[in-house]
């Protein structure tokens, strides 16, 4: 449950970058863990940041934040069913912290979403929310992924002026 953030200087080459991207996006149960330099990585959204490095940016002295969300405005996670909780506990009996943090993730994630919305209201954050999200993190249909990319690109081009205004 520890957050690791890599910077440009931590990446040796394209292969190393690929490993680090995979490590940060690995989903428990759906993908195997990634091992880098003897350390096992399971999910970029499991550490203290819950996948959004707002506190790391604050620690670096930033007071304004440009945040790119992957879910529409208002999206919140829900508590896992008891059956799903039992599945995670069984699947990760050798790594109980993975199970427990995944099971409990919805509450701190939702609190972080609330905080981001507050920052946006005060002008301390500019947040890009996709108008729609027609794919999931398990989508493998190439055409659906291309359509989603094109939809997101069109929205970003539409919204760029708003970001430029916020940046001043």
Model-derived segments and spans:
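Patatin-like phospholipase
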Residues: 1-168
């Amino acid at each position: 449950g520890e957050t690791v953030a890599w910077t440009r200087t931590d990446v040796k080459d394209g292969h190393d970058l690929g490993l680090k991207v995979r490590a940060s996006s690995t989903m428990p149960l759906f993908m195997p863990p990634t091992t880098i330099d003897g350390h096992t990585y399971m999910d970029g959204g499991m550490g203290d940041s819950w996948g959004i490095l707002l506190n790391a940016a604050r620690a670096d002295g930033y007071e304004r934040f440009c945040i790119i969300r992957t879910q529409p405005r208002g999206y919140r996670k829900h508590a896992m069913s008891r059956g799903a909780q039992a599945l995670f506990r069984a699947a990760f009996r050798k790594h109980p912290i993975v199970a427990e943090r995944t099971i409990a993730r919805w509450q701190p994630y939702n609190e972080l979403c609330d905080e981001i919305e507050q920052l946006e209201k005060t002008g301390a954050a500019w947040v890009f929310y996709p108008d729609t999200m027609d794919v999931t993190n398990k989508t493998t249909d190439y055409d659906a992924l291309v359509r989603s990319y094109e939809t997101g690109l069109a929205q970003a081009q539409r919204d760029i002026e708003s970001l430029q205004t916020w940046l001043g």
